[in-house]
């Protein structure tokens, strides 16, 4: 689940049984290029299942139910929580709305042997990993802190206050990157995407180190 703002409370559900499909959980700070990388992966992995979040907020102009989000009522979302139907969920903007990752579509894709990509924030990645220990968590990192600052400021879409808040959150996220199974440095889109494709389709080394994750790092070098 890609949150629209910082979650106030993050919740998970009971562990899910493993299957044949590989599940990659992608996270990283704002402006690191997650959306661009996700688009690349969806183009290159034809049978990829990209997890679409459920949310209680109203659709924005141009958003399509089932494509951008599964838009549900607060009552229905609570029912999903009660049924244990979410891998993770969060309360956004002090409980203004809730968003979460539906377990059933992920489970079905795994059963079909399809690779699954879930894009979530740091807390969401931890919750999914707890619910699905066999999932591979991947942190998409910038080449440097200065590069991340430049990307965030260069977008020109946020106020200085919002930028400062996002950078503060990014510092926390960057400090936690070695908690992930893999770290991919997004220096160049082509290399970062190729590395993630190999993780999704199973051509990369073992999913995770059962003796204790060290956050194996792969740097996408510029040409």
Curated annotation (Swiss-Prot):
A single Pfam family, by name? Guanylate_kin
Where's it mainly located?
cytoplasm
Subcellular location per the Swiss-Prot or TrEMBL entry: Cytoplasm
**EC primary class:** transferase
Keyword Ribonucleoprotein among record annotations: no
List compositional bias (Basic and acidic residues) regions by residue number.
7-19
- Chain intervals for the UniProt region annotation (Disordered): 1-22, 204-223
Q: Where is the Guanylate kinase-like domain?
A: 21-201
Can you tell which superkingdom this protein's organism belongs to? Answer: Bacteria
What SUPFAM superfamilies does the database record attribute to this sequence?
P-loop containing nucleoside triphosphate hydrolases
Q: Which PROSITE patterns match?
A: GUANYLATE_KINASE_1, GUANYLATE_KINASE_2
- Spell out the family assignment given in the record's similarity comment: Belongs to the guanylate kinase family.
According to its UniProt entry, the function of this protein is described as: Essential for recycling GMP and indirectly, cGMP.
Name the UniProt record assigns to this protein: Guanylate kinase
Lineage of producing organism: Bacteria, Bacillati, Actinomycetota, Actinomycetes, Mycobacteriales
């Amino acid at each position: 689940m890609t949150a629209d703002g910082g979650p106030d409370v993050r919740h998970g559900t009971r562990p899910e049984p493993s299957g044949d499909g590989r599940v990659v959980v992608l996270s990283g700070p704002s402006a690191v290029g997650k959306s661009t990388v996700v688009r690349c992966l969806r183009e290159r992995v034809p049978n990829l299942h990209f997890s679409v979040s459920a949310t209680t907020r109203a659709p924005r102009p141009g958003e399509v139910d089932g494509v951008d989000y599964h838009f549900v009522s607060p009552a229905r979302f609570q029912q999903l929580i009660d049924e244990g139907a979410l891998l993770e969920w969060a309360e956004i903007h002090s409980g203004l709305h809730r968003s979460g990752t539906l377990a059933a579509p992920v489970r079905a894709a795994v059963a079909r042997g399809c690779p699954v990509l879930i894009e979530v924030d740091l807390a969401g990645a931890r919750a999914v990993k707890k619910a699905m220990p066999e999932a591979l968590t991947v942190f998409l990192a910038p080449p440097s802190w200065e590069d991340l600052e430049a990307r965030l400021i260069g977008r020109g879409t946020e106020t200085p206050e919002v930028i400062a808040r996002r950078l503060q959150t990014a510092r926390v996220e960057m400090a936690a990157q070695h908690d992930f199974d893999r770290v991919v440095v997004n220096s160049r889109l082509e290399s970062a995407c190729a590395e993630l494709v190999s993780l999704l389709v199973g051509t990369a080394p073992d999913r995770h180190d059962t003796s204790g994750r060290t956050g194996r790092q792969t740097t996408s070098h510029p040409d």
